[in-house]
């Protein structure tokens, strides 16, 4: 199997790993970098559990070939301040937790780009993050609290 040297910034730290040429960013993060907060839900880019920020943009890491992250900045749920996740949890945003990392990363991006909500509703924006437990009301309330700065 062919391999290549992948260098990128992960949660503010420069790293280099030798990975298979067909590796997904998700696998590099979980198995080579031990960022296990990034979850694989569907493996097809439909559920959002594997969402990370790649050069500041939310992406489903299960769909990103690892080589596309070469020279980029990747931010995972491990980099998010505990207070940020605590705000989401305080509203009952998650139950089983499988979707939580992706929701946190999407909410993190949205908190930095609230102007997006002038173009679309919060519920519509979060539709890329599937949750089988909550019925979404808690998710929407939690993300709204984080984005708007409510307690």
Region locations from a protein language model:
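Signature of N-terminal electron-transfer/Fe-S-associated modules in redox systems
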Residues: 1-151
């Amino acid at each position: 199997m062919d391999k290549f040297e992948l260098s990128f910034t992960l949660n503010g730290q420069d790293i280099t790993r030798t990975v298979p040429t067909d590796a997904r960013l998700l696998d590099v993060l979980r198995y080579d970098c031990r960022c296990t907060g990034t979850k694989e839900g569907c493996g097809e880019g439909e559920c959002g559990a594997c969402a990370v920020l790649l050069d500041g943009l939310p992406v489903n890491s299960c769909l990103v070939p690892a080589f596309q992250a070469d020279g980029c900045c990747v931010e995972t749920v491990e980099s998010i301040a505990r207070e940020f996740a605590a705000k989401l949890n305080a509203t009952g945003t998650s139950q089983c937790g499988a979707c939580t990392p992706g929701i946190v990363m999407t909410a993190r991006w949205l908190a930095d780009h609230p102007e997006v909500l002038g173009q679309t509703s919060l519920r519509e924006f979060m539709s890329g993050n599937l949750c089988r437990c909550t019925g979404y009301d808690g998710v929407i309330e939690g993300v709204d609290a984080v984005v708007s700065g409510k307690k």
